[in-house]
Swiss-Prot record:
Residues 1-23 form the signal peptide. It comes from Homo sapiens. It holds the Pfam family TRAP-delta. The lineage of its organism: Eukaryota, Metazoa, Chordata, Craniata, Vertebrata. Residues 166-173 are cytoplasmic. This is Translocon-associated protein subunit delta. Keywords: Congenital disorder of glycosylation, Disulfide bond, Endoplasmic reticulum, Isopeptide bond, Membrane, Signal, Transmembrane, Transmembrane helix, Ubl conjugation. The gene is SSR4. Heterotetramer of TRAP-alpha, TRAP-beta, TRAP-delta and TRAP-gamma. It is a single-pass type I membrane protein. One of its GO terms (cellular component) is extracellular exosome. Its main location: endoplasmic reticulum. InterPro entries: TRAP-delta. Disulfide bonds join 26-57. It is linked to Congenital disorder of glycosylation 1Y: A form of congenital disorder of glycosylation, a multisystem disorder caused by a defect in glycoprotein biosynthesis and characterized by under-glycosylated serum glycoproteins. Congenital disorders of glycosylation result in a wide variety of clinical features, such as defects in the nervous system development, psychomotor retardation, dysmorphic features, hypotonia, coagulation disorders, and immunodeficiency. The chain crosses the membrane at residues 145-165.
Amino acid sequence: MAAMASLGALALLLLSSLSRCSAEACLEPQITPSYYTTSDAVISTETVFIVEISLTCKNRVQNMALYADVGGKQFPVTRGQDVGRYQVSWSLDHKSAHAGTYEVRFFDEESYSLLRKAQRNNEDISIIPPLFTVSVDHRGTWNGPWVSTEVLAAAIGLVIYYLAFSAKSHIQA
């Protein structure tokens, strides 16, 4: 009986140490961000934002779960094939995607659970510190020329027809 109790205590100790290792926080994160945003609204239906980061931690934590918050909306962050590479993406209607800087706040599992708890309790989520933040500069989307090429071609055609008809009338007169 005593052997079973000590074996159970050993298993509990092993499980608790494993859970502490897997949920280890990233200390002093160093990031290398890159991002892409849609610039042409003529050929797309929504503005897409893609943020890729390369993350290294001072304590060498790898493959941690990350979550992103953009303007109060949360998105899961996917891990890349390479160690320490992560990506998050989202899309907005062209009218909603204003030109300017978007702050993408990244959270680990612990701070993300605090964020979700604050949301459930209708508390201010801006007081929860992110693991790190990436600023995405979106310059807006180009909606094409003010006058479509078809209308411009038709107008030029009408002007040429008028000039040709006028010249013909002057020659025949």
